[in-house]
Amino acid sequence: MRESNTLSGGIFALLNRAIGSVLLALIGFYRTWLSPLLGPHCRFIPSCSAYGLEAIQRHGPWRGGWLTLRRLSRCHPFTPCGCDPVPD
């Protein structure tokens, strides 16, 4: 029974790494190709893409992705700007 738990844990860890890599690649694509075309318009420090990179690297793809989505939902003209670091 223990071998199956180890195997499922290994698969889950591999899946987490794969999803994290895809999310980081998407942010990298945005920063390299789309952001120069759109210009800087983020209301926060750090920028939303830098926030996303740090959140995913620090908290993993699930919580980091959720934090990034919440941050993106707050980045609009009706929200006050300012410093919004990734939480611990």
UniProtKB/Swiss-Prot annotation:
Functional note: Could be involved in insertion of integral membrane proteins into the membrane.
Cellular component aspect of the GO annotation: plasma membrane
Span of the signal peptide: none
Membrane topology of the entry: Peripheral membrane protein
Subcellular compartments: Cell inner membrane
Chief place of localization: membrane
Keywords of the record: Cell inner membrane, Cell membrane, Membrane
Protein name as annotated: Putative membrane protein insertion efficiency factor
InterPro entries: Membr_insert_effic_factor_YidD (IPR002696)
Source organism of this protein record: Prochlorococcus marinus (strain MIT 9313)
Keyword presence, Membrane: yes
